[in-house]
């Protein structure tokens, strides 16, 4: 089965920063795959533990019906055509009901737009979904200020999902990002929403430069959430202020434990060896 076609709201693709050689092994002592990583080499990145699971999206979308905004909630996999296992789907829908999700976002199923006088309701003003004149809120509702979609991204993980049996004997959901329309929220905003929803958040490991992160993963570290002692999958790193590159893409990358294991198993050392770059793989 080939790779699934990415959907419009599929989570940001997270690449490694290394090129690969003709044996599909990382080339950790050569140039990085993108020039911005060299420029940012000595900057501190926020690092989260990489979880081995299946990507899950919780999409909250709006519709305008008569005099109200109506919100709907759906659960999706990595792509729109991806299937969620029966066990995980049951867990998600029973644990994170529509009301819980909307409450965590400060929304209600049906939000009245205008009062009996034709002015924006207090709820619309509180949300600042109204026109603003010289810094003052007006009584005029402004639909362009209402987000079209909130997306909560996370990982379904646990027994029966990838090799995640060492994490836990059942299945669960752990969050790692929240997006409002096309903007990913900062860590503090993300955490606030997941905490209100009662969702565990991927473990924050700390701040690292790129070289520090590479060395940290190469040495290996245990998963912070696994019930059984087990090496973590690696790190996912991003800039604290969610910077983007010149193509408008998020600066986010991963360093994987298994890549270093494969390097050692192939070459018998963690030191630099002669490698020939694979022109087709990263």
Predicted regions and their residues:
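Core nucleotide-handling region used for phosphoryl-transfer chemistry
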Residues: 1-282
């Amino acid at each position: 089965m080939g790779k699934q076609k990415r959907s419009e709201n599929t989570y940001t693709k997270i690449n490694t920063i290394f090129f690969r050689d003709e044996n599909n092994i990382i080339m950790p002592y050569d140039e990085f795959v993108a020039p911005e990583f060299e420029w940012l080499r000595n900057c501190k990145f926020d690092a989260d533990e990489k979880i081995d699971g299946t990507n899950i999206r919780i999409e909250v979308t709006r519709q305008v019906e008569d005099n109200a905004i109506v919100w709907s909630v759906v659960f999706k996999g990595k792509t729109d055509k991806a299937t969620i296992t029966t066990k995980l789907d049951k867990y998600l829908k029973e644990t994170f009901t529509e009301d819980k999700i909307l409450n965590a976002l400060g929304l209600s199923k049906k939000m009245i737009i205008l009062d009996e006088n034709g002015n924006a309701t207090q709820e619309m003003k509180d949300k600042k979904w109204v026109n603003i004149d010289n810094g003052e809120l007006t009584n005029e509702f402004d639909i362009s200020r209402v987000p079209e979609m909130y997306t909560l991204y996370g990982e379904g993980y646990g027994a029966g999902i990838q090799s995640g049996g060492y994490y836990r004997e059942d299945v669960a959901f752990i969050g790692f990002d929240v997006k409002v329309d096309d903007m990913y929220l900062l860590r503090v905003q993300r955490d606030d929403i997941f905490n209100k929803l009662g969702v565990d958040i991927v473990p924050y490991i700390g701040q690292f430069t790129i070289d520090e992160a590479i060395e940290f993963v190469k040495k290996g570290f245990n998963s912070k959430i696994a019930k059984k002692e087990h090496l973590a999958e690696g790190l996912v790193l991003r800039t604290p202020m969610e910077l983007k590159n010149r193509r408008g893409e998020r600066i986010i990358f991963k360093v994987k434990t298994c890549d270093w294991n494969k390097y050692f198993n192939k070459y018998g050392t963690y030191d630099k060896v002669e490698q020939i770059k694979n022109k087709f793989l990263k």
